[in-house]
From Swiss-Prot:
PX domain segment(s): 65-195
pH dependence: Optimum pH is 7.4.
Keywords, in A-Z order: Cell membrane, Hydrolase, Lipid degradation, Lipid metabolism, Lipoprotein, Membrane, Phosphoprotein, Repeat
Membrane topology per record: Lipid-anchor
Protein name: Phospholipase D2
Listed Gene3D superfamilies: Endonuclease Chain A, Phox-like domain, Pleckstrin-homology domain (PH domain)/Phosphotyrosine-binding domain (PTB)
Any one of the GO CC terms: brush border membrane
Span of domain PH: 203-311
Membrane in keyword set: yes
Amino acid sequence: MTVTQKNLFPYGDYLNSSQLHMEPDEVDTLREGEDPADRMHPYLAIYDLQPLKAHPLVFAPGVPVIAQVVGTERYTSGSKVGTCTLYSVRLTHGDFTWTTKKKFRHFQELHRDLQRHKVLMSLLPLARFAVTHSPAREAAAEDIPSLPRGGSEGSARHTASKQKYLENYLNRLLTMSFYRNYHAMTEFLEVSQLSFIPDLGSKGLEGVIRKRSGGHRVPGFTFCGRDQVCYRWSKRWLVVKDSFLLYMRPETGAISFVQLFDPGFEVQVGKRSTETRYGVRIDTSHRSLILKCSSYRQARWWGQEITELAQGSGRDFLQLHQHDSYAPPRPGTLARWFVNGAGYFAAVADAILRAQEEIFITDWWLSPEIYLKRPAHSDDWRLDIMLKRKAEEGVRVSILLFKEVELALGINSGYSKRTLMLLHPNIKVMRHPDLVTLWAHHEKLLVVDQVVAFLGGLDLAFGRWDDVQYRLTDLGDPSEPVHLQTPTLGSDPAATPDLSHNQFFWLGKDYSNLITKDWVQLDRPFEDFIDRETTPRMPWRDVGVVVHGVAARDLARHFIQRWNFTKTTKARYKTPLYPYLLPKSTSTANNLPFMIPGGQCATVQVLRSVDRWSAGTLENSILNAYLHTIRESQHFLYIENQFFISCSDGRTVLNKVGDEIVDRILKAHEQGQCFRVYLLLPLLPGFEGDISTGGGNSIQAILHFTYRTLCRGEHSILHRLKAAMGTAWRDYMSICGLRTHGELGGHPISELIYIHSKMLIADDRTVIIGSANINDRSLLGKRDSELAILIKDTEMEPSLMDGVEYQAGRFALSLRKHCFSVILGANTWPDLDLRDPVCDDFFQLWQETAENNATIYEQIFRCLPSNATRSLRALREYVAVESLATVSPSLAQSELAHIQGHLVHFPLKFLEDESLLPPLGSKEGMIPLEVWT
């Protein structure tokens, strides 16, 4: 020992690092010319956590750990103890920097632990790195020398030298992996396997704590927690990152709980708020977590550090943003739209192939056997096969499904879960909720590696795939038939037929017409359930979108919130078999490993409808965004939606989307402004029923509330517009649907195009796309759960608006022009100018096209719904007359040549003389009206 050391430690309490000397080959060699970031642990390490005393590889190999004692704090902790010194140690490992505070006795305890570790390993050389624990510290506690009470400890002139000595001592040990990775050292340095994962953000705050049970704010949760006496304290390893915290079981390494920071975040220290000496209380909307520290100073420091971490890159989640959304607008986001399932499914398939770490999927309905690229000639693009291959590569697949009431819905989520879970252990599926409820998880989302996210109206399910051709038939190539044999007992009903010569676009249950017949026997996916030789399929029109970067992180965070909420609330998911998910930091969100081509930069904000039952918090930002966008629109609104139930009466219907449309049109009328509203709806609701007899009770119930919104009753849009402007409302608003035709069995056929889109375009600059219908179920927040995004263009291009030059957004304009092109049949109309959606010439062309098409379809097919059938009696007489398509197919074909596109007027007078509410004695009549609205 040198003289300096004797002066620093006059009582013999010095640390002699030579006692821990290792052979040269046991010292880490540090490589030069390498980026330390490339050596950090991969994100997938979060799924393979080890017990804290199992010597897991915490530090990145070859990347040095450098310690610097940057200061001291001296304080008096009591008359019997005297003055204590706290050393602030700043550590650096690659790009990670953090600070820990230690007393000198902590260095002494570490030194003795490392000595014991070296002795034990020298006695058991073959067991090196296999020992899972060192002798208990408590057993050797009486041998620990006391901290010096005087001399150098109380002398300021020795402080700098002592700091330097401790710094050199640590740095020498940290060059040797034998000590650096030992659990006593990692605990001293407050690091774990989660410390140095770049995608989790900064190092954060870590350490051993005791946490109190309870404190959850979950509906239906009954337990003893805050304000109760029957709680328990448990030892845990706490990890605090920039937007969440978690704690782990030290003995297993398993994550026991994840708490996402949100606007309810608050940190309080002290006995008054925690009911615990040296307590720290961390509040969010989901839980009040109480921790116990070893001293008041530690509690105060931890409270301060947790608050500062939350105010870092994750501070966006500590407050509500525009439209009361949990996520702020994200400028510079790459986004791409998709109309119809063909392009959307193909892009989803490409993204799945690029997945390296995680795939998140949540759907109202998911069909494992769906083909994402068609026609399929092998299983390569089948969803379940793709997910299995990625799982075999190590990708973690997490799927959330809506658990339906089986008597009401036939989507068979239980079959989907069993099928997917049997594929590979890396595929986890949870269903929610367990309790019978009137509401559903209706959102559709797929996230890859928390960096690319797809959402919109498209479930990955049967019947959704379509393209701009909207085919009514799918008979394949008669010369190359695909035999879809009925499985025999003991065979695999999901086995794929030979597809080597397949020409079908829709195999088995995928060929559908949901009004003719709802899906049945979904566990036999490749068996037809309607006769494709006699029954046309119903085309499916839908809209989706993909976003990248920080917006994708926001969507992933929503999924993680729902996943962890479900895991917390359902007992069967509390096992380690279903891991907690962790959100990646927004600080690394712009490091895109891949992109979906064809995107455009815009400002994107994630919106949602959630409630305490669905996600543990309440939000209705989708409704707020709709109302604001309509209110602030200057020139036009283009809306496609599966439902349109609005116009609040304060009792039955509560959302005010329809009211805002009325107010905006009245404002334009008063100011003499040119303003247009284009509204596209499905001609019939998507429920099984025979429309020739008036449809089923479900169809009529939805029609009742749709017509109540549009044109029937004092609260309806047209009633209020007519009262103010008479027939002039036609200059402002167009209400239409879509229809197409084809040939089957040598005869012309027609079917409506089922509009399932949930989209709004305003002024060729603003777009809303998501899963939310325009009704109370989707928009109020406290009913169905939904997702959407608000897109505001930042890149403009020249266009026209009411005959005047106009700067239109590239995203909105390209989407709107594509929609208009398909709807109006622009491929056969080469001189059609779609730039100006407001001018009189275009609006008149739109209205005339819809009227002409509707007239031709009615003359040829006597199709329903129709304005000619205002009562059930008139309906019976109407359908009793044979159509021209039946009487004279050739003449019908010649007339159909005059059809332009797919646009038809919505029949506003259909069954207007009838009450369409379900009879009280029917099962539909016994359902609360809120289910239909």
